[in-house]
Amino acid sequence: MTYPYQKILPLEFENPDSNQLLTESYKTLGALHSVLCRGIEFTSKNQFPIVEPYSGNIPEMFCSVHRLRKKPDSLLRGICAHYYTSDSNIEPFWNYPFRYLQWLRKIGYVISTDFSIYTNMVLIQKLWNSFRNKLMSAFYQRNGVNLIPAPSWGDLDNIELYMEGWPKDSLIAVNSTGIGQDKQCRHIWLDGYYAMLDILKPIHILRYGAYMEGERKDISTYYPNNNKPGYRYGS
């Protein structure tokens, strides 16, 4: 389904894609984040944004998006920018989404935003961040960013909600940083990982962070959590 934009935001703009209109006239978009929903498909069940699958090349270099701001454009084409960083580094991209579009289009690959979904959050907080990640992903795809979908989850009980809207049979990215050696966190991560495999059936996984015992190495490419060049393929 297509989001009923005019029913949600019955406002007219001279140029809804104008950086000046949407990022300089307002300190943040606030309620005008509804503008991002224009032209985006949503699931019929819970109205999560629908993210299209990715089937392109596998990148060789990962770097956090906030570390790339001062890099010359000539170096951006071979880099995969990720949002596996503090939420404070992601918020500017949410608050000023149009401001960064032209720059993001110059980057070879961009992984979905990764607003945190913590186990100690209440459910609505988890779903809000899941919604934001999907909305930003669909918005980027619609505006010419070479986006790699990156599903995430916070608990097994609501895994279907976390996965709703992410593409099936796609190359995806998955993060394990922050899990560490905590047994409960590893257990939650692995349970969600197996459920994600069953629901989305990804064709390949770009894995950022440490390998977790029991995951599918045969369909994974592993990238170290150091924001430096280098990668290795799963066996």
Features from the language model and the residues they span:
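Intrinsically disordered, low-complexity segments enriched in small/polar residues
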Residues: 1-3, 24, 52, 220
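Eukaryote-skewed repeat-based solenoidal scaffolds used as protein-protein interaction platforms
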Residues: 69-73, 80-81, 85, 90-234
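Phox homology (PX) phosphoinositide-binding domain
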Residues: 2-17
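Non-catalytic, usually N-terminal nucleic-acid engagement modules in DNA/RNA processing proteins
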Residues: 13-104, 121, 196-199, 233-234
